[in-house]
From Swiss-Prot:
Region described as Interaction with SNRNP200: spans on this chain: 146-300
Ranges annotated as biased composition (Acidic residues): 1-19
Region annotated Hom4, chain positions: 198-238
Gene Ontology cellular-component annotations: cytoplasm; nucleus; spliceosomal complex; U5 snRNP
Species name: Mus musculus (Mouse)
Biological processes, Gene Ontology terms: spliceosomal snRNP assembly; spliceosomal tri-snRNP complex assembly
Known function: Protein associated with the U5 snRNP, during its maturation and its post-splicing recycling and which is required for spliceosomal tri-snRNP complex assembly in the nucleus. Has a molecular sequestering activity and transiently hinders SNRNP200 binding sites for constitutive splicing factors that intervene later during the assembly of the spliceosome and splicing. Together with its molecular sequestering activity, may also function as a molecular adapter and placeholder, coordinating the assembly of the U5 snRNP and its association with the U4/U6 di-snRNP.
The name this protein goes by in its record: U5 small nuclear ribonucleoprotein TSSC4
Keyword NAD: no
Region (Hom3): 147-183
Family: Belongs to the TSSC4 family.
Lineage: Eukaryota, Metazoa, Chordata, Craniata, Vertebrata
Compositional bias (Polar residues): 108-117
Region of interest (Hom2), ranges: 74-101
Amino acid sequence: MAETEAGLEADEPTEDDTLPSDTVSLSDSDSDLSLPSGVEVQVLSPERLSEEGQEDSGPEDPPSPPTGTLTTAVQPFHLRGMSSTFSQRSHSIFDCLESAARQAPCSAPQTSVSDNGSFRRPVTPPSQTPARGLSRVHGNTGPTRVLPVPDYVSHPERWTKYSLEDVSEASEQSNRDAALAFLSSRSQVSHTDYVPSFNQDPSSCGEGRVVFTKPVRDSEARAERKRVLKKGVGSGAGGEAAVELAHLAGPEAEEWSGHQGQPEVVVPSEAAHPESSSGPIGVKAVGFHGSKKRSRDHFRNRDGNPGGPGSERGPSV
């Protein structure tokens, strides 16, 4: 039994083991600030502190003065079960914070909580309000800006004044009458020089339509002249006249038809070609020539004259 009791006494932790040593320093880098078992954190009111102080003090010590003014002060932070050195350090830290808070100027009015739980703002002193108002008034004062004088006031000769006093006020009825009179005068204007465009003629006969025609070329005009000449020759011979080709090597063969070289119809007279008079009466030779120039040596005379221009070389194939 004695051995068992001795073992139990050795296993029980003592108060010195639970308290941290004074040499251990506190730092901001400590992440785990867990307190050992048995340590209680309490917030002591000033009344409780005074009661504890009276209990700790002896009967011979004089009583402490009443602390009625400390009721509104901030309740100090106190840890029970810690060493005296740690308690002094904590008190010194919080005292420094409180002194720094007192020295800092109040930039904004702080709200306080009344007894019924509603927030109330402190009333600003009335002495500061007129001073700020006067400072703003004095700060805004400056040289007044003079507005420029208008030009029509300083130089009235440059401006012309118009007045509508002599003009009668127009009504809606007068405007309507003026518009109708203008439209009636426009409708009475004759449209003699008006030519309706395509598909704008109101009549059913289609007068004034635009007819599109193909432009006439020079070759078509010459062909038309050929037909007119044929009709004239036929009517002079009694309707049975024949058209013969004149000799291509004649003097009329070298005549060219303008600058474009189109073929032309040439009707030689009997005085120029006496040999053509041997034919039937009313027969006229018609010569055709192209735009390409040909040599006379390659052509043979119609009547087979050996003294012709092509008799020396013989007939051309």
